[in-house]
Amino acid sequence: MRCTVYARWFLWALLLSSLGLHAGPPAWAAEKTGVHWWQAMRGQLEDAVEELAQQFNASQSTYEVRPWYAGTYAETLTAALAASQAHHPPHLVQVFEVGTQTMLLSGAVYPVYQLMQDHHIAIDWSTFIAPVLSYYSKQGRLYSMPFNASTPILYYNKDAFGRAGLDPTRPPRTWQEVEAFSTTLLRAGAAPCGFTVGWPSWTMVENMHAWHNQPFATKYNGFAGLATKLLINGAFGVKHIGQLAAWQQAHIFRYGGRERAADSTFLQGECAMYIQSSALIGEFMRHCPFPWGTGELPHWGAPYPKQNSLIGGATLWVMQGHRLEEYAGVAQFLQFLARPAQQEAWHRQTGYLAISQPALDALQTAGYFQQVPVQWTAFGQLTRAAPTVHSRGIRLGDFVQIRDIIEAELEAIFAGQKTAQQGLDEAVDMSTAVLQAFAARYR
């Protein structure tokens, strides 16, 4: 079965390579050196990607960046690695954060720090915010270019809060307040459910461990070597997931599905609070039918310290196998993306985080966060504390598969089929087999 699936991706990668790398719309200028970028965004975000490329292309006369939609995040990662094995990789590929370890060990990438050194382009990476820089660096060197960065935050329905007699300007700050606010909302009939979440493993397991400075996996979450075991079935993990399961039975919490399946539950007013990616702010500003606000992730309080949340989204990886003059164009494009003015514009347009301090300073000087206060929540949460070995990120092999394992066990727990301890124990056991198999491949 695995061979069949891989063969399908291999053939698709070859097709994308032949279309994306060797054939171009007539509008592409033939005299320019092409830089082929496989990306994973659709809709308005794809339009923003196209606009970025057009801006760079108009800024100079030598290179032509050519974005190409290669599928979902997981599809794009698989296709890019298959294309690399077929010796037809793109120059750039957008890979989500859970693919970091796979890319690092693939042998298919040209590290960004090395690319910039080779082309004598200086970027002060120290100005990038610490959680972003630490997630994608190895031994202090940046391996991929941070691009669309986000972190989970809490959204809440101000109308529902008002109907329940709650202060619409004050979101809950602790999990105890989430429970109390939800109970008030239910009793007042202001909403049928208190809160829901998106991307359950990312928001409720990965980020909750980091937010409370708890270890997620061995080897300092994989940063000190190949992790071979998750640590999510300890006292903290069982406490948190067990409480979610109890709240599910009391209608305080409603499990809404994986990824963005719960969006409609919040947007239709069924759940008054929603923990989801900060990347949705722009979309909610355009389409949410009621007034809403944002708050930091709820915290359990003592004895757990409040740390920083984890970064999400994706970075741009440079692939091996191209000519020197083409890499010069790649380096110039990444330099273009790193400019503070470009970071500021990207944040304003998409809602993704501006990831350098100069860009943040420019936004603050312009009064942007006073005008759009919901946009500050994610920045404040990410930068409130220096990352620790437990909160700088998670670097696991086959992380996509591990997330699927965790979320399947969460679903069994929330359905009442297993206790939190049973489900998390099984998630650890199954993921251990995946991690050990991955480690064996790269030893």
Locate the predicted segments by residue.
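Glycine-centered hinge/linker elements that transmit conformational signals in sensory
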Residues: 179-184, 222-256
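Extracytoplasmic "Venus flytrap"/periplasmic binding protein-like
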Residues: 55-128, 163-165, 173, 265, ...
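Extracytoplasmic/periplasmic solute-binding protein
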Residues: 138-147, 152, 177-228, 271
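Short, solvent-exposed loop/beta-turn-alpha elements that line the ligand-binding surface or hinge
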Residues: 113-128, 171, 214-239, 286-287, ...
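Extracytoplasmic/periplasmic substrate-binding proteins
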Residues: 40, 204-207, 238-329
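A structural signal for short loop-to-beta-strand junctions that line the ligand-binding cleft
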Residues: 82, 91, 121-160, 193, ...
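Long, aromatic- and glycine/proline-rich binding clefts that accommodate carbohydrate-like moieties
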Residues: 295, 348-408, 412, 440-443
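Hinge/lid segment of periplasmic solute-binding proteins
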Residues: 97-153, 179, 206-210, 293-295, ...
